[in-house]
From Swiss-Prot:
<comment type="similarity">
    <text>Belongs to the SHLD2 family.</text>
</comment>
<dbReference type="GO" id="GO:0005634">
    <property type="term" value="C:nucleus"/>
</dbReference>
<keyword id="KW-0158">Chromosome</keyword>
<dbReference type="InterPro" id="IPR049507">
    <property type="entry name" value="SHLD2_OB1"/>
</dbReference>
<feature type="region of interest" description="Mediates interaction with SHLD1">
    <location>
        <begin position="721"/>
        <end position="891"/>
    </location>
</feature>
<keyword id="KW-0227">DNA damage</keyword>
<comment type="subunit">
    <text>Component of the shieldin complex, consisting of SHLD1, SHLD2, SHLD3 and MAD2L2/REV7. Within the complex, SHLD2 forms a scaffold which interacts with a SHLD3-MAD2L2 subcomplex via its N-terminus, and with SHLD1 via its C-terminus. Interacts with TP53BP1. Interacts with RIF1. Interacts with ASTE1.</text>
</comment>
<dbReference type="Pfam" id="PF22779">
    <property type="entry name" value="OB_SHLD2_2nd"/>
</dbReference>
<dbReference type="InterPro" id="IPR053944">
    <property type="entry name" value="SHLD2_OB2"/>
</dbReference>
<keyword id="KW-0234">DNA repair</keyword>
<dbReference type="GO" id="GO:0006281">
    <property type="term" value="P:DNA repair"/>
</dbReference>
<dbReference type="GO" id="GO:0010569">
    <property type="term" value="P:regulation of double-strand break repair via homologous recombination"/>
</dbReference>
<dbReference type="GO" id="GO:0035861">
    <property type="term" value="C:site of double-strand break"/>
</dbReference>
<dbReference type="InterPro" id="IPR029715">
    <property type="entry name" value="FAM35A"/>
</dbReference>
<protein>
    <recommendedName>
        <fullName>Shieldin complex subunit 2</fullName>
    </recommendedName>
</protein>
<feature type="region of interest" description="Interaction with ASTE1">
    <location>
        <begin position="1"/>
        <end position="568"/>
    </location>
</feature>
<dbReference type="Pfam" id="PF15793">
    <property type="entry name" value="SHLD2_C"/>
</dbReference>
């Protein structure tokens, strides 16, 4: 027995670090009572034993996948071994299925010598294992767990790092185990860097990050660094943010399930259809419109498929080129749960679509299977790398058979009037305390105690490096007085947006999993899981759900909640929002998680080039608008999906008044403010000045405008010689555009329309897109770079700044006008659009429109304008003006028509 290979495995690590790794920061930490435990894993040609210090025990009742031919030892060896079983106390029962007819492959002698000469302790695996409880709200810090695996001298035994008690394989000379427990690559776990030798790191990495999300951070030398790291971990990708908005807005529609007969939405499903033609004032989204997501690389798109849980998240080693992973779904998932076996057969790939619909029993969340059944054969080669850009998960089919209709001025969403979906009743449910078998799926009727936000797990190594896996946890309880956490993985994580405190939910096809790090068991979603939200505790009538679940079980749950959680009765009932009665709101009265209409003035635009998400199979940048209803009270409106196509039109009409419909209000927990987001049902309309909605908006907007010095005319202002911000009413007589020190272009009432049009190329220039500095050209007519803005090298066309001469009676002054205000005077027509035609079938260009605007503005018969200017007077001791300077701050061309006094 002593001649066989030995693997020494230590488990039961204390909370506090070992003495050899203790620093001053961890000196005060308490260690646990349980000491280290030591067993000897002895392996020979025909047997496998786990030898404790006092007794021998055998493993049983577990199976593992067939070994994938390990390349870790030289020589060919044909192993014909029988299954050996070992029992170990303290829940250390794991499967070991020795491989049959598995040929070990040759390896290079250099690697063999490296392995056999590793006569040292491997102490590098320092995993930050935080544990946060629900009551502490992710704030209490625990110490690090240090797992140290030893290897005695004068032996060629391979030490195991990060021993995974859920899955390991044994072949000749522990070859298969080496694929899981040994490593050659680096993994960042918390602040430490450890050395590993296998590419199958994604499972351990995701597991550690999962603990980091649902636990507090470990003690670090710098608390501030830990806080920064925690804040960065909570940040989600733009893809997840996009899908969160889509899901939350969908839930806002479906929240009116209690009014099945009266609601205009009888089936509110994320997958909707669009009719081919659009009538007046209707906005339709194309049928091929689909929202695809890159961020959720779930391995099944590239053929690297797991069963349903994170514990089967076992990526393939790149070095084992002959290994293939297949999953057989024909035998049913029930046969695969207890074993960790990967079958070589055809597979119907697991579903990865969010599907939310209104059924007769409540809001049903499920996952749609969009993949057809096909044979999956995956070779672990470099061609099979599934990156974040390749794992496009079709999550939503947006806007099929859905339209916005304007009927008598009131917009409502008219959707398919089919009968609501029926949810097949599940009479057999299990209490949480009875969910103890890992080889069985359970249906649980529970109450939600605490939902949470969707988080993400970053995959840093392996074939799926760079991708992210969404994760949410919901704490539930039932009449057995057992509280459990439910882990919702991947697309199921977005179901967390459909549940609230006190909701009664039915979870189907969930499995039990043991979190070996935290030491608790959790419920976990599978690819076939569904979630049915019956509603809040206070609004449920058991007889209404007799066709779904047993009324006895439901009554018992309600009775338990009433006696043990009576505080839920005092929660105000959620008021479902009526789609046909969505109101126009004022921004200062916004409420989160509702759909609203709003009339807004667009102030500015921001495009986040690094915030990219997938929409209709393409990368799309996040577009944010700055809008206002009151002077200088700005809010954020984010354009998602189809709404991003509005950006060019909104940019051309910057400063105009727009009507937006079906916006979703969500709280930004980073900035602690409310933001508006477009939905697949949103629409926008630019309002003309004579529109009653625009007139009403201006009346409210002008009341909120700050008070200016009221000046009746220009002469009075020049006589008072007061510096400050003033409003004056005057007529524009000339616009002069300096080109060089000795050359300028002057436009006035005597300029013809033709001469103005021919002058347009000279009143624009090409400058730095960041600072606006005019760029010179070299001898090859190539623009030079703006050195002050490097490495930013983008260019943009601007209007030249001008000197505006205004006249009021016998007095005239010159006012400096910046490039942005020239663009505003020209109805926000950008300088780079002058050569574009307005519509493809027309020959009229934007340059012609700009020339006509200049000609009308400078005409003798032109109406006077109201100008907001900044005036500066420098006076001597006799109040004689030594210097006077005027700068234009804003321009109001139509305010005189409605009365300048209203503005003042």
């Amino acid at each position: 027995m002593s001649g066989g290979s030995q693997v020494h495995i230590f488990w039961g690590a204390p909370v506090a670090p070992l003495k050899m790794t203790v620093s001053q920061d961890t000196a005060s930490l308490m260690s646990v009572a349980d000491p280290w435990k030591k067993i000897h894993l002895l392996y020979s040609q025909h047997s496998l034993y786990l030898k404790d210090e006092k007794q021998h025990k055998n493993l049983e009742n577990y199976e593992v996948p067939e070994s994938v031919g390990s390349p870790d030892f030289s020589g060919h060896f044909l192993a014909n071994c029988m299954n050996r079983h070992v029992h170990v106390k303290d829940d250390f029962v794991r499967s070991v299925s020795e491989t049959q007819n598995i040929e070990s492959q040759n390896i290079h002698s250099s690697r063999l010598s490296d392995i056999t000469s590793s006569n040292m302790q491997i102490c590098g695996f320092k995993s930050t294992v935080p544990h946060l409880t629900e009551e502490e709200k992710y704030q209490k810090l625990l110490s690090e767990n240090k797992i140290i695996d030893e290897q005695p001298k004068h032996q060629s035994d391979i030490c195991g790092q990060n021993f995974n008690t859920n899955l390991f394989q044994l072949g000749h000379k522990c070859a298969a185990m080496l694929d899981l427990v040994c490593s050659t690559e680096q993994i960042n776990i918390g602040p430490e860097v450890v050395q590993r030798e296998c590419v199958s790191t994604e499972y351990h990495e995701i597991q550690n990050q999962c603990l980091g999300l649902f636990s507090s951070n470990a003690v670090d030398k710098s608390r501030s660094e830990a806080a920064v790291r925690k804040a960065s971990d909570l940040k989600i990708s733009t893809d997840t943010e996009f899908l969160s908005i889509i899901t939350s807005s969908q839930v806002a529609f479906l929240a009116q399930k209690k009014d099945k007969g009266r609601s205009p939405i009888n089936k509110g499903n994320v997958n909707m259809e669009t009719e081919p033609k659009a009538s007046y004032r209707e906005i339709r989204i194309p049928e091929e419109n689909s929202i695809q997501l890159d961020g959720f690389t779930e391995a099944y798109e590239g053929g690297q498929n797991q069963a349903y849980s994170l514990e089967l998240f076992s990526p393939v080693c790149r070095k084992t080129e002959n290994s293939r992973i297949h999953i057989n779904s024909d035998k049913g998932l029930e046969e695969h749960i207890g074993s960790q076996e990967l079958f070589n057969s055809e597979d119907k790939l697991p579903p990865n679509e969010i599907h939310i619909e209104l059924c007769s029993s409540g809001i049903l969340c499920s996952q749609l299977n969009t993949f057809h059944k096909s044979a999956i054969k995956r070779s672990c080669t470099s061609e099979d790398k599934v990156g974040q850009s390749e794992a496009l998960s079709r999550v939503l089919q947006v806007a099929k058979k859905m339209k916005l209709i304007s009927n008598g001025g009131d917009s409502a969403v008219e959707m398919d009037r089919r009968n609501v979906s029926e949810f097949k009743g599940i009479k057999k449910t299990s209490l949480i305390k009875n969910c103890d078998s890992k080889s069985q799926k359970y249906n649980c009727l529970v109450m939600v105690l605490s939902p949470c936000h969707v988080k993400e797990i970053n995959i840093k190594f392996g074939p799926n490096s760079g991708s992210k896996v969404p994760l949410a946890t919901v704490t539930v309880i039932d009449q057995s007085e057992t509280k459990k956490k439910v882990f919702l993985w991947r697309t199921a994580a977005f179901w967390a947006f459909t549940v609230f405190l006190g909701d009664i939910i039915l979870l189907t096809d969930v499995v039990i999993r043991e979190d070996q790090w935290v030491g608790e068991t959790v419920l976990q979603s599978t690819f076939s899981s569904q979630l049915l939200n019956l509603g809040s505790y206070s609004s449920i009538q058991p007889e209404e759900y007799s066709s779904v679940v047993s009324d006895v079980v439901l009554q018992d749950l309600l009775a338990y909640v009433s006696s043990k959680h009576s505080y839920l009765r005092d929660l105000p009932p959620r008021q479902p929002q009526r789609v046909n009665s969505i109101d126009f709101v004022e921004l200062e009265h916004l409420q989160p998680d509702v759909l609203v209409h709003a009339v807004l003035r667009v102030v500015d635009f921001t495009i986040l080039t690094e915030a990219v998400y997938s929409y209709r199979g393409q990368k799309q940048k996040k577009v944010m608008l700055t809008v206002e209803q009151a002077q200088d009270q700005h809010y954020v409106l984010v354009l998602w999906g189809p709404g991003a196509a509005w950006y060019p039109q909104l940019q051309r009409k910057k400063g105009y008044i727009w009507e937006f419909k079906y916006l979703f209000v969500q709280r930004n927990y980073t900035l602690e403010n409310l933001e508006l987001h477009t939905t697949p049902w949103s629409s926008c309309e630019c309002l003309f000045n004579d529109d009653i909605r625009a007139i009403t908006f201006k009346a409210k907007f002008q009341k909120s405008a700050p008070s200016f010095v009221k000046i009746p005319d220009l002469a009075t202002h020049l006589e008072d010689k007061c510096s400050g911000v003033v409003l004056i009413q005057a007529q524009i007589s000339e616009l002069a555009f300096p080109i060089t020190a000795a050359q300028k272009i002057a436009l006035n009432a005597h300029s013809s329309l033709k001469s103005i049009f021919s002058s347009l190329p000279n009143i624009v220039y090409t400058g730095c897109a960041k600072c606006g500095l005019e760029l010179e050209t070299d001898e090859n007519r190539i623009y030079k770079q703006c050195f002050s803005c490097l490495p930013f090298t983008m260019k943009k066309i601007y209007y030249r700044p001008a000197l505006m001469t205004v006249v009021d009676g016998r007095h005239d002054v010159c006012i400096r006008v910046e490039s942005k205000l020239i663009e505003k005077i020209l109805l926000n027509i950008s300088a780079d659009c002058l050569n574009r035609v307005i519509v493809p079938s027309s020959e009229i260009t934007y340059g012609m429109v700009v020339a006509d605007l200049f000609h009308s503005l400078l005409a003798v018969s032109a109406e006077p304008c109201v100008l907001k200017i900044q005036s500066l007077f420098v006076l001597d001791e006799n109040s004689y003006p030594l210097q006077q300077d005027f700068s234009l701050l804003d321009f109001y061309s139509d305010i005189v028509k409605h009365g300048a006094d209203a503005r003042l």
